[in-house]
């Protein structure tokens, strides 16, 4: 079977790159797999597989529709698996709507509701959808009931993220008397980290021996066009006078730390927190969860089903609309503070939620995700499945 992957270059550190990287070895067994690699300029040269690079002066848009078009002609795949959000689909769906032998399957995330105005037409042209949450499945089916698909959660690699001895780690780093919170989120506005910093200020008034680790680096995030889109977290930490209580580990390029170090920091943590306005899945929930760490998240989007009985959900107090018609949910720092204090002061609850999180995360192996996909690919080809627009 010839499979063309489309998404962030699998060697990068983004969430989508990780999702592709985890399942790639299993997809490649007895199959010919290539990738249209977003953000990759061709260097260093990838010697392990054929990769179509997209970052060139001639390609003006990050999503590189013309490179995808070339790859389709050059490779003639049986399956095209796109791994991205839903909102960007209009940038590539015209190319994928052209009649061909391939079956287009989208493994997609949705972080807000309803499905935005502009990506709805694209649903009609995909042969099948792998939703990364039941939330996404419901929102898409409300727009296009005839869309075929199933929910396949992303994986967490047990070789990289695994449970260590928390007591020994805390002793090793002289942190036995310290409450440790972790938030593996970039400065992207949607991640809402400054509100967590506001909540931390209030937590410190009652639990002064508390620190927050922000391991995603301090690089300003950028839009696909290269403009800055995100908070200068280091400046926020200084402005809020939290320098002594917020740790900002980063690599030499000011970006995210390596996975081995990240796993240690998850294991040091007592609570994992994502205060986002919305999440398409939330990989940190399972990366921390596989180490038995409970989570706190906002009761909306995919977060509701991923956290469930594996932590605490905060009810949003307000929402705001995006320009594309979808809306994000906003939590209040006081509610975030209350949830943090509640879990910090109840070790029994932390253990209970942590066990449920670990049990859930351990089921999401890369091999199991890849098997579900490969089985479906074979069926789509055998049955010559068609998109909703051609049925």
Question: For each of these PLM feature ranges, what is it?
Answer:
Residues 135, 155:
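Carbohydrate-associated surface elements
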Residues 277:
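Aromatic "clamp/platform" in nucleotide-sugar-dependent glycosyltransferases that forms part
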Residues 226-264:
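Nucleotide-activated donor-binding/catalytic signature segment of Leloir-type glycosyltransferases, i.e.
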Residues 4-5, 175-191, 197-200, 212-216:
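Conserved donor-binding/catalytic core segment of Leloir-type glycosyltransferases
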Residues 161-175:
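A short helix/loop element that forms part of the nucleotide-sugar donor recognition site in Leloir-type
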Residues 335, 345-378:
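A charged, aromatic-enriched C-terminal amphipathic alpha-helix characteristic of glycosyltransferases
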Residues 285, 294-297, 302-304, 312:
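Short hydrophobic beta-strand element within catalytic cores of glycosyltransferases
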């Amino acid at each position: 079977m010839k499979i063309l992957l489309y998404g962030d270059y699998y060697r990068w550190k983004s969430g989508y790159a990780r999702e592709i990287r985890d399942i790639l070895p299993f997809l490649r067994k007895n199959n010919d797999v290539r990738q249209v690699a977003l953000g990759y300029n061709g260097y260093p040269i990838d010697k392990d597989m054929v990769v179509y690079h997209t970052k060139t002066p001639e390609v003006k848009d990050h999503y590189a529709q013309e490179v995808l078009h070339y790859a389709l002609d050059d490779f003639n795949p049986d399956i095209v698996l796109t791994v991205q959000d839903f909102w960007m689909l209009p940038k590539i769906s015209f190319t994928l709507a052209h009649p061909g032998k391939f079956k287009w399957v989208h493994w997609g995330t949705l972080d807000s509701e309803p499905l935005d105005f502009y990506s709805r037409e694209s649903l009609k042209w995909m042969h099948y959808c792998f939703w990364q949450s039941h939330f996404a499945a419901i929102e898409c089916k409300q727009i296009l009931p005839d869309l075929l698909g199933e929910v396949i959660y992303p994986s967490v690699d047990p070789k990289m993220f695994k449970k260590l001895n928390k007591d020994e780690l805390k002793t090793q780093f002289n942190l036995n008397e310290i409450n440790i919170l972790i938030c593996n989120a970039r400065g992207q506005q949607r991640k809402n980290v400054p509100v967590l910093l506001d909540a931390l200020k209030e937590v410190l008034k009652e639990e002064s021996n508390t620190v927050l680790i922000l391991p995603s680096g301090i690089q300003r995030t950028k839009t696909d066009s290269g403009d800055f889109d995100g908070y200068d977290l280091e400046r926020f930490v200084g402005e809020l006078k939290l320098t002594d209580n917020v740790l900002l580990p980063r690599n030499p390029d000011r970006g995210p730390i390596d996975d081995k170090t990240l796993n240690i920091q998850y294991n040091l943590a007592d609570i994992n927190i994502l205060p986002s306005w919305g999440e398409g899945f939330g990989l940190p929930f399972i990366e921390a969860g596989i180490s038995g760490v409970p989570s706190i998240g906002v009761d909306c989007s995919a977060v509701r089903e991923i956290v469930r009985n594996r932590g605490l959900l905060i009810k949003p107090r307000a929402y705001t609309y995006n320009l594309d018609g979808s809306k994000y949910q906003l939590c209040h720092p006081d509610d975030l503070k209350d949830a943090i204090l509640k879990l910090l002061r109840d070790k029994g609850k932390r253990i209970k939620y942590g066990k449920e999180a670990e049990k859930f995360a351990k089921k999401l192996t890369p091999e199991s995700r890849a098997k579900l996909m490969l089985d479906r690919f074979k069926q789509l080809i055998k049955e010559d499945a068609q998109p909703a627009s051609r049925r």
